[in-house]
Design a protein with these regions (language model features):
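C-terminal helical "lid" of AAA+/P-loop NTPase domains
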Residues: 95-100
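Helicase P-loop NTPase motor core
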Residues: 1-44, 67-71
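Accessory C-terminal helicase-associated subdomains
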Residues: 8-17, 29, 115-187
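Conserved short internal alpha-helix adjacent to the catalytic or cofactor-binding core
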Residues: 40, 51, 55-85
Length: 187
């Protein structure tokens, strides 16, 4: 609203070009509301000093979890979350899933289900994949049943998937900021 007022000159001042306007924020998660508004009104912008909110790794990961729940056909989302956090599903296991999905002309989620039913995968990876697939199905049902509002469901998905816990256990200096970004995303 403030930016539109400056641009249109509705506060008793002449209209101003936004080319030389800057917004300073203390923490990166504060940029989200600005970015949302800029995208809504079609205002081009640049973020200096860090990536845009929706380009951050943790936001893209979280969005992939939310996308796979709304569409289990979303192979890009599944590829992003299958081993995030680590589930013991390395490149070989992921290649087997891709081959099975291609063989049956189906999604990666369905390919993973087929692979598990054929007992092609073993060990920790198979157990963790089974848990992930059953969680995705359960989250889909919760979404359909409208058992939770969207904020509660997003928090539940990120918690139960282990994604929030991964960042809580991370001891790098970036981890607290990433957790703040996740909180900002779901609120």
């Amino acid at each position: 609203e403030e930016i539109e007022a400056i641009q249109q000159g509705t506060r008793g001042e002449p209209p101003k070009s936004l080319e030389n306007l800057a917004i300073l924020v203390r923490a990166s998660h504060q940029m989200r509301m600005f970015e949302d508004r800029f995208l809504t009104i079609g205002l081009p912008y640049r973020v200096i000093g860090g990536p845009r909110f929706y380009e951050r790794m943790e936001i893209r990961d979280a969005m992939a979890y939310l996308r796979i729940v709304t569409s289990s056909e979303d192979d890009l989302a599944f590829e992003r979350i299958i081993n995030t956090p680590k589930r013991g599903l390395g490149d070989k296991a992921q290649q087997k899933i891709q081959l099975k999905a291609r063989q049956y002309s189906t999604s990666l989620v369905e390919g993973a289900k087929i692979l598990l039913s054929e007992k092609v995968l073993g060990g920790k990876g198979a157990i963790e994949l089974g848990i992930l697939l059953s969680n995705i199905q359960r989250w889909e049902n919760l979404l359909k049943d409208q058992a939770f509002n969207h904020i509660e469901l997003a928090e539940l998905i990120l918690d139960e998937s282990g994604y929030t816990g991964m960042w809580q256990n991370d001891k790098t200096p970036d981890a607290p900021g990433r957790l703040e970004n996740l909180k900002e995303l779901v609120k």
